[in-house]
From Swiss-Prot:
Superkingdom of origin: Bacteria
Protein name: NADH-quinone oxidoreductase subunit D
UniProt similarity note: Belongs to the complex I 49 kDa subunit family.
Upper taxonomic lineage: Bacteria, Pseudomonadati, Pseudomonadota, Alphaproteobacteria, Hyphomicrobiales
Topology in the lipid bilayer: Peripheral membrane protein
Amino acid sequence: MTEHSIRNFSINFGPQHPAAHGVLRLVLELDGEIVERVDPHIGLLHRGTEKLIEVKTYLQATPYFDRLDYVAPMNQEHAFCLAVEKLLGIEVPRRAKLIRTLFCEIGRLLSHLLNVTTQAMDVGALTPPLWGFEEREKLMIFYERASGARLHANYFRPGGVHQDLPPGLIDDIEAFCDPFLQVVDDLDALVIGNRIFKQRNVDIGIVTVDAAMAWGFSGVMLRGSGIPWDLRRAQPYEAYEEMEFDVPVGKNGDTYDRQVIRMEEMRQSVRIMKQCLAKLRAPDGQGPVTTQDGKVAPPSRREMKRSMEALIHHFKLYTEGFHVPAGEVYAAVEAPKGEFGVYLVADGTNKPYRCKIRAPGFAHLQAMDWMCRGHMLADVSCILGTLDIVFGEVDR
């Protein structure tokens, strides 16, 4: 019998694949049904964000961050605002801190709802995304009532937030919380307890503690392996040090553990939201929502009607922008997908000299080849879904 050289089979996964979660192209090398190699091709959504920020003022640069992880926009703005505030050395009013914390947790719900339900859809369950999007719609309306926009909010500004919450919004968010917990329980029973979902996800894409550290993972990818690292707890920012919440961690580091953690994080987010709402109602939660420094934040409309100086401040702020002292700073937040960091270099002018964006999805996607080797072709979409990738932030 003559020997035949067996050649591996290469296929393209994407860029328009329904399970690719964006414009991802994977070149898969298969031996039968077993994945031998995965070659991710990124950059199909590259828009040159970091370079664009260098020619915009600090205020004009803020909306670019909404367009990175567009599933939870305000969490990205948060990191940039923290970086600018560190360089300016300004203190954010307490009410603004509470509003920021509240909307960051709403962003976490938006992201986790989308991820858990669409990953269930990749596995074959069609009901969860329909339930999840119904809840996301309510949260989008809260975004819209606070900022005027459902998606690209541009609500967080250096020095605070753009405007105070409209009357009645705090009551409506509070009315949303308890029924939402019931929806989370229903999703938990439908997805996490599902026999088929378990068969598709348990012991798939296992990440050990050492591997998670070596690949530079953060967020749920790190906690799924049993490392209790959460920036909200480890390096508290804004009002998180006042909040009581638990950090759920996994045991096995597989795709199933990561989805269980995301479900539990939604419950913890609601817990934080309730505390924020109570503090916003308290007497010490009242007051301004942006810094009173006229060089950084615009004056009130009332001031502008009366004062020539306020009008000049307003004009200079929106034409030239504020000048940030020369220096460099790294600010990171616990975004829903992991540690989202902004390394900002200022040269004393009104524009950033350099703004490096550290996207968690980028670090997670680089391990795709390592995680998929030896798995079946059908497991690739399970692993990709649990990485929680959004291409706005990967390609930037």
